[in-house]
Amino acid sequence: LACCLDRDKKGLSIMTNNAYQVIARRWRPKQFSELVGQDHVVQTLGNAINMGRIAHAYLFVGPRGTGKTTSARLFAKSINWEDGPSLEVPEDSDIGNAIMAGRCLDVIEIDGASNNSVDQVRDLRDECQYAPAQCRYKIYVIDEVHMLSQQAFNALLKTLEEPPSHVKFVFATTESHKVLPTIVSRCQR
């Protein structure tokens, strides 16, 4: 553990916690080969990357804690690697490390539960027109996409029908039945 014993003002031993990190975050996979229990996801995304047939939108569905957001980050890292799309990216990749840490300007993670209005989706649609700053692709990861309003889904539909070539979407949800069929039909599952 990242804890250590220290002494307080009275000389008593206390636990200090300078660098505590949740186990799930500490052991989060950094490569597709480390992703456990998601062989079908690794196979599908690996085939898309290796064949150069990367879809413009993906829908990741599953219970909480099964690796949807982690898979989205790994996918973003794989297709934005400096030397071209690859399933396994070296640990020393600057862009890859920034993506996995959530610090990359071109991989935007959005919480659908708190950013679910039509105006916010329209802003996203306007942002899509700008080219990526660092990466090959600008990737929008929308977590809990089922929480978007009907109007927000409709605002997103036009962008999904005619996406800019530099934009990819990854939608993650625990409740796919709440996502509009018109959105689902435009995504790779």
Language model regions located:
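P-loop/Walker A NTP-binding region and its immediately flanking N-terminal helices
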Residues: A2-R189
